[in-house]
């Protein structure tokens, strides 16, 4: 059983229940919806069909964020090296071979002579040779084609776009209305961009969690404040590989993963994980290694984009990713758990989480059970990337789905029992029924003062068979009085 989570991009053109069910049973944990390519009606159809398949699949919706795109063209335009092109910021005017219009009116103000403007994910490069008021003059640097509504990147330049477009705001309200689990905000440059989304959520009393997509140099430079302001991070390597030197991507990816682990924040590695499988039934060896290396770096989750949104082999892509993940995890676990320094030496929850993980290695404990109001203890445990799963007992469906982005966490909904004893034994029964544990196995139980707000206060280790033999008549340790806030 894999412990790395899988996010699948889904198009409203292919989102029927049978298709989504196949992806779910192949290993999909989260459905991602890209608002750049789907209408509100299409988004609602994906949501409805996903919830028909399972209430346990998390839903994530993208914003467009502060991006620049070209306007429409009648047909793809062919450019040769040396062609001269004028560029204007006229979002309502179509583009031609001689004049390319872009969606940002002040584009010419923010771009300088000597800058490279990259179109269509870097497929077409134009060098700015002249700037005259609202007009830029560019020279084509490589042969290529330019179609409608293609991405525009200017590496190294700060484009003064607002954090949210009007379409973004409408889609955030749609996410609130539909009770989506995550919003993935695109092109995040600083904590201020995250807070712009959070402000709207707060105004509507929404508990949707924000995933910040790191796609440019500013996002990399400000990563620490962005992590602090976000629920989690997505390393979106497509635009990132255009905005920064491509040879730096592996180092940036590893650094961001490490920072997220230290902050106990979920992290997703995305873009071209199995790109070949859009058209082919098998991946390249390089793609297999890319997935494995992301897992060796201890990512929480991996994302499929075109592979599941429009590819010919979507189910096979998920199955392939799941197999690679499971094999890489088994290899990674031979090296022991991740050493995560305590950020607060007086934090009881951190100390007990580390002790529980160490018990899985030193005492042969086969799993950890914890109950959770918000998922924080489960995320603390996930940060260590232990060899055995964490069973998180959640009292809210939403918390269960939030944990679909946390490594090694099996989140299950369970109604609230009257005592720790009842909750623990019910969890043991469920684990046995699902085949996760046997009577001879040891299990760790991490919990606290029963009820809301008690915090994590004790760690108990029991042999499964002994618990059942006593017919559940065992006593958990006295709960420690603590001033710590609950999760």
Give the positions of each predicted feature.
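Non-catalytic helical/linker scaffolds that mediate oligomerization, partner binding
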Residues: 1-487
